Design a protein with these regions (language model features):
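Bacterial N-terminal signal peptides
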Residues: 7-16
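A short, well-structured edge-of-sheet supersecondary motif
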Residues: 47-77, 307-308, 314-318
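Active-site-proximal alpha-helical segments within enzyme catalytic domains
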Residues: 89, 177-181, 225-246, 305-321
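Active-site Gly/Thr loop motif
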Residues: 206, 211, 263-316
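Active-site-proximal loop and beta-strand segments within enzyme catalytic domains
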Residues: 25-35, 45-49, 87, 96-170
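Active-site SXXK
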Residues: 68, 82-107, 134, 178-182, ...
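Active-site helix/loop module of the DD-peptidase/beta-lactamase fold
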Residues: 100-137, 186-224, 229
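Structured C-terminal helix/loop/strand segments within mature extracytoplasmic catalytic/sensor domains
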Residues: 299-349
Length: 349
């Protein structure tokens, strides 16, 4: 029998609340959902094709949001599961607030901050990496890290092979150390801070501080910080960045920080990399192997966790894969195809 996505009845009723073309751009306590995507200009046939494609590739839930309203949703979007590496984009928001508050200086070095690690400890050269270098994944510190897969460990460059700031390598050591720097600078645990500074102001419906946990390693001092978040809360976070950090009349994350974070500083196979966000544009301007819409940016995590923001269309595409529900992985090229299909189904295309 053909598998189908399901929706809890109460959630469906909530999402199906009347949603007209005139909206505030952000959801209130509940998401609004288009009563008829076709009447709003969306292709019903192409949306059905997207549903079939999601089942084909193994997504466990997904959402399309335009103008702050749910166009379509599949799966249990209230179910919380591991965001994996999307955690880094979440941390970005907290660091941006701390920078604006004067608690973190992007140009401070690891040496100045007293950062070292287990033996073999950091060299004097490695300690010259700055907070900015870590945000860009250009620290040049290739120490073992918590929550590092076997493949990541095998691909890690040799220690001392690149000076700080000169080479991009997607590096869990950088990201985990940023978490430590944030907690030390603010005196607040990441999950408590995220709940207070982000989740509550933007009305996340499901997240609590208990939905975060740390993963440690015998090889490094700095733990990974993992978030279990629902698809609908993840979509709210993406919408916050689509709106340059503003939610209704409140500037939750500084606008200049959002803009700095979502521009490319390095090239990657699908475009570029900013401050803990992936970008559809490359830093060099050269086309890359996997194509996302121009000007887009996204959070990305293991197994197929994505929140893709397409500012030119006021559009968000969320894809989730719960590893407790399936053994499948949705790959980046498949997500690029998903976004392409969504854009093709949108009004005017």
């Amino acid at each position: 029998m053909r598998k189908s996505f399901y929706f809890p009845v109460l959630l469906l009723l909530a999402l199906a609340a009347n949603a007209n073309s005139q909206t505030s751009g952000v959801p209130a306590a509940e998401w609004k959902r288009l009563a008829s995507p076709e009447q709003a200009g969306w292709s019903g046939k192409k949306l059905a094709g997207i549903r079939d494609y999601l089942e084909e590739i193994g997504s466990t839930s997904a959402m399309i949001v335009q103008h702050g309203v749910v166009v379509a949703a599949w799966g249990d979007v209230a179910h919380k599961s591991n965001l994996h590496s999307c955690r880094k984009s979440l941390l970005n928001s907290l660091i941006g607030i701390a920078v604006a508050d004067g608690k973190i200086n992007l140009d401070e070095t690891l040496e100045k901050l007293g950062i070292d690690d287990k033996k073999p400890s950091l060299t004097d050269v490695e300690k010259q990496a700055t907070v900015r270098d870590l945000l860009e994944a250009r620290s040049g510190v290739y120490h073992a890290a918590a929550y590092e897969t076997k493949g990541m460990a095998e691909e890690r460059p040799q220690r001392g092979s690149h000076a700080p700031g000169t080479f991009w390598y997607y590096n869990n050591w950088d990201f985990n150390t940023l978490g430590h720097i944030y907690e030390t600078a603010t005196g607040t645990k990441i999950f408590d801070a995220f709940y207070r500074e982000i989740a509550q102001p933007i009305g996340m419906q499901d997240f609590t501080p208990r939905d975060g946990h740390y993963v440690t390693s015998p090889d490094s001092l700095y733990p990974a910080y993992l978030f279990d978040i629902s698809a609908r809360d993840f979509a709210r976070f993406a919408l916050l960045y689509l709106h340059d950090g503003k939610w209704n009349d409140t500037q939750v994350v500084p606008e200049d920080w959002v803009k700095a974070s979502t521009r490319p500083y390095s090239d990657a196979e699908s475009g570029g990399y900013g401050y803990l966000w992936w970008t559809g544009d490359s830093a060099s301007g050269e086309p890359q192997r996997i194509s996302f819409p121009k000007g887009s940016f996204w959070a990305e995590g293991h197994l197929g966790q994505y929140a893709v923001v397409v500012p030119s269309l006021d559009l968000i595409v969320v894809n989730r894969v719960d590893g407790d529900m399936t053994k499948r992985t949705v790959h980046k090229r498949q997500v690029a195809r998903l976004v392409e299909m969504v854009v093709a189904a949108a009004p005017g295309n």
